């Protein structure tokens, strides 16, 4: 697998393409589209790693987002 930095950039590019392809126009559209993407990703993790691991990943992600808000300008 590529480095975390490389994979992070690939994810950013894919999310941009996904949102554009989905016809996202508003911040609420971004939320809805990304929520569906998060759900699909969690199910993919569950399919190959099991339900407990999927829940663990979602919990870890929730904790990280809750304690590390984006800086002004939205660049992480």
Write out the residue ranges for each language-model feature.
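Solvent-exposed interaction surfaces and binding hotspots enriched for charged
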Residues: 1-76
């Amino acid at each position: 697998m590529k480095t975390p930095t490389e994979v992070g950039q690939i994810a950013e590019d894919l999310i941009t393409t996904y949102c554009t392809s989905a016809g996202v126009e508003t911040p609420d559209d971004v939320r809805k589209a990304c929520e569906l993407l998060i759900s699909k990703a969690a199910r993919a993790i569950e399919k190959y790693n099991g339900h407990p691991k999927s829940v663990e990943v979602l919990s870890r992600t929730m904790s990280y987002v809750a304690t590390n808000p984006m800086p002004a300008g939205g660049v992480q």
